[in-house]
Every structure is written in C-alpha cells, then in structure tokens.
UniProtKB/Swiss-Prot annotation:
Keywords: Apoptosis, Membrane, Methylation, Mitochondrion, Mitochondrion outer membrane, Repeat, Transmembrane, Transmembrane helix, Transport. Residues 1-93, 177-209, 280-322 are mitochondrial intermembrane. It is a multi-pass membrane protein. The chain crosses the membrane at residues 94-104, 156-176, 210-229, 255-279, 323-342, 372-389. Residues 105-155, 230-254, 343-371 are cytoplasmic. The keyword Disulfide bond does not apply. GO terms for cellular component: membrane; mitochondrial outer membrane; mitochondrion. Widely expressed with a predominant expression in brain. Residues 1-76 are annotated as: Disordered. GO terms for biological process: apoptotic process; neuronal ion channel clustering; positive regulation of apoptotic process; protein insertion into mitochondrial outer membrane; regulation of signal transduction. It holds the Pfam family Mito_carr. Belongs to the mitochondrial carrier (TC 2.A.29) family. The gene is MTCH1. This is Mitochondrial carrier homolog 1.
C-alpha cells in the first residue's frame, strides 16, 4: 500500500474508518418505550427504567466530561493525551515502515530479483516473484538494516501532523452526542446518524490528508530513490525547496485526488455496509447465556454478544472495502513519484502520465491495478514486466 495515513495498513484503516459503521448500538426499542412513558408522567426520563432492562445510572456525556472539546484528551490532560497518541502512532509507523517501503518499491514495478518456478494449489507450474521477506533481505544486503527505514522521517512528520490536525478539529468542531439505535424499526433514525457521523469523519480525514500530503510526497520520493540509487531528496527542508523550485506549489499535491477519493469511498462504503448488516442481520435479543436467563440476572450482558458481532462486522467490512479501494491508493502513490526526476518515475518503470486518470487507464490495460496488494504470494501476471539488475 503506498502510504496512506495518513497511510495505514488495511486493518488499521478499517478500524479507524469503521467508527461510525456500527455506531448503532443496541436496545433502541426498550429505550424508546421508556422515553414515551417518561414524557407522559413524572419523574423525568433520566430517572425511569425499563421494567425488564434497568437503565444504568446517568453518566456525564463525553462532551460534558471534556468541557466540550471533543478532542483526544479531556480537560487539563488533553495535551498529554494527544502527545501520547502521537508517540504511539510514531512507534507503530516506525515498526511498519519496512513493510510500506517494500510495498512501494513493488508498486512502482521495481523487481530486482527474477521470479522462481513454483506450483499453485492445483499443482500447476507458475512463476512467483520474491515475497516481502526475500525483498527485505535484498534491501538489507544493498543498504544495510538502516536502509529499511529510508524515508521514515517525513512519514513520521506526516502522521504526527495528521493526528494533531484531527485532534484540533475535534476541539473546534466537536461531534454531537450519539444516541445508540440499532433496531429495524429505527432504521431511518439510525441511518441518519450513520450519515452524520460519516460526514464528520470524512471532513476530518480530507482536511488532515490535504495538510499532510506534501510530507507524504516527500516520503514516497525518498523511498523510491532506492531504484536508481539517487540522492536528490535527502532531507525534509531541502526536499521542500527542490519540489517548490521544480514543480511549484502544485508539486506538493500530486496524487492527492485519488487518495481523497479512496478515503471517501472507503469511509462511506465501510460504514454503510456495516450499518445495514448490523441493522438487518444482527439480533439484539440474543443473549450470551443459555436459555436467555442472563437477561434478568445480568441485564448488562444481554447485548454483549450483539455488540461483539458488530465490532467484527466493522473489522471485516474495513478489510473488504480497503481491498476494493486499493487502486486509488496505488494510483495516488505512483502519481506522487511520476516524472519527478527519479528513475522510478520514468520509463521503463513507468510512462509519464498526464493525469491520474491516465495512470488508472494504463494500469487497468496492463492488469496491474492491484500491483503490490499482496506481499507473500506474488504471481507473475501475463501483462507484467519487471527490470532485472
């Protein structure tokens, strides 16, 4: 995957984007009934409880607890919490960087090692390209272990900027309080909630993507210098100067449109699919205790099984939709390095593309729209062509 996070691996991406997908929590029917009864008499609704499913004691909402900030932290601890998020994100980014590095080199078509003959599950002879581990060993042989972390600095800065941007936006534009609904009878209300949540998440993702994309471009170009052994982009500040001098301001945003489209399609596809599956296929009345005895003895456990299923639904939908939107990621990364003076962005590795649509059509004709999506079992396709060193 080239990068995204704002680049993240599919499983991480699915978890982040699916926040709204299963936001429809359980128990809407009982809650709605209690609300109607409470409006007709005293005491207020907050003090009424469903006869079968007692309502827990009222807790302050997330917005009230953090003073309406809606950010990563709450109160005086917000800066510390946000710094912790940035630090954790930096650790994950550093650990996953070799994976992203190898993936990007495969995306641009750099195959320094010849394929090997193997057999598939049907026993047929096929040609396999080197796996991620073999490719990583090759990089270590050429550049040493430190070579696996080429381009890490701008990527760390990109992800940190994205995290801080999202946290700041939550403080400036705090999300509305979320009421959990999931019953089929409340489908219209639930769908409106999912649409509202997804729109909010889309706004944050698009803004953070646009602000962090220049650093993403620099990181991509630093990594693909491995192909031609160049040293054109050696630091963040010097890279900014080179890009601005050679390509102008637009040079920092090449490949942005396909990345934005991929993010938008992913968010809406993942959240809506998860919502409809959870609303129509997940039964809130299923108890996780035999015979349903747990409903009265432990009311809080009634919906634990349904909530667990919903969490798995979000995860699975995130992986499935991320696979479908992978071509947007590939095209965005290829455009970021295309015709920038590096060998990886010029023939024979890649033609000079006029636009990202031109790049998409070219990859589609070549059957390469999913190039780099698999890092373990990589078969040589009929339309593939790779360079040998």
């Amino acid at each position: 995957m080239g990068a995204s996070d704002p680049e993240v691996a599919p499983w991480a991406r699915g978890g982040a984007a699916g926040m709204a997908g299963a936001g429809a929590g359980a128990g809407a029917r009982g809650g709605a009934a209690a609300g109607v009864e409470a409006r007709a008499r005293d005491p207020p609704p907050a003090h009424r409880a469903h006869p079968r499913h007692p309502r827990p004691a009222a807790q302050p909402s997330a917005r009230r607890m953090d003073g309406g900030s809606g950010g990563l932290g709450s109160g005086d601890n917000a800066p510390t919490t946000e710094a912790l998020f940035v630090a954790l994100g930096a650790g994950v980014t550093a650990l996953s960087h070799p994976l992203l590095y190898v993936k990007l080199l495969i995306q641009v078509g750099h195959e320094p090692m010849p394929p090997t003959l193997g057999t598939n599950v049907l026993g047929r002879k096929v040609l396999y390209l080197p796996s991620f581990f073999t490719y990583a060993k090759y990089i270590v042989q050429v550049d040493g272990k430190i070579g696996l972390f080429r381009g890490l600095s701008p990527r760390l800065m990109s992800n940190a900027l994205s995290t801080v941007t999202r946290g700041s936006m939550k403080k400036v534009f705090p999300p509305d309080e979320i009421e959990q609904v999931s019953n089929k009878d409340d489908m219209k209300t639930s769908l409106k909630k999912v649409v509202k949540e997804t729109s909010y998440e889309m706004m944050m993702q698009c803004v953070s993507r646009m602000l962090a994309h220049p650093l993403h471009v620099i990181s991509m170009r630093c990594m693909v210098q491995f192909v031609g052994r160049e040293a054109k982009y050696s630091g963040v500040l010097s890279s900014i100067g080179k890009i601005f001098k050679e390509e102008g301001l637009l040079g920092f945003f090449v490949g942005l449109i396909p990345h934005l489209l991929g993010d938008v399609v992913f968010l809406w596809g993942c959240n809506l699919l998860a919502h409809f599956i959870n609303a129509y296929l997940v039964d809130d009345s299923v108890s996780d205790t035999p015979g349903g005895l747990g409903n009265d003895q432990n009311p809080g456990s009634q919906f634990s099984q349904a909530l667990a299923i919903r969490s798995y639904t979000k995860f699975v939908m995130g992986i499935a939709v991320s696979m479908l939107t992978y071509p947007f990621l590939l095209v965005g990364d290829l455009m970021a390095v295309n015709n920038c003076g590096l060998q990886a962005g010029l023939p024979p590795y890649s033609p000079v593309f006029k636009s990202w649509i031109h790049c998409w059509k070219y990859l589609s004709v070549q059957g390469q729209l999913f190039r780099g999506s698999s890092l373990l079992f990589r078969r040589v396709s009929s339309g593939s062509c790779f360079a040998l060193e």
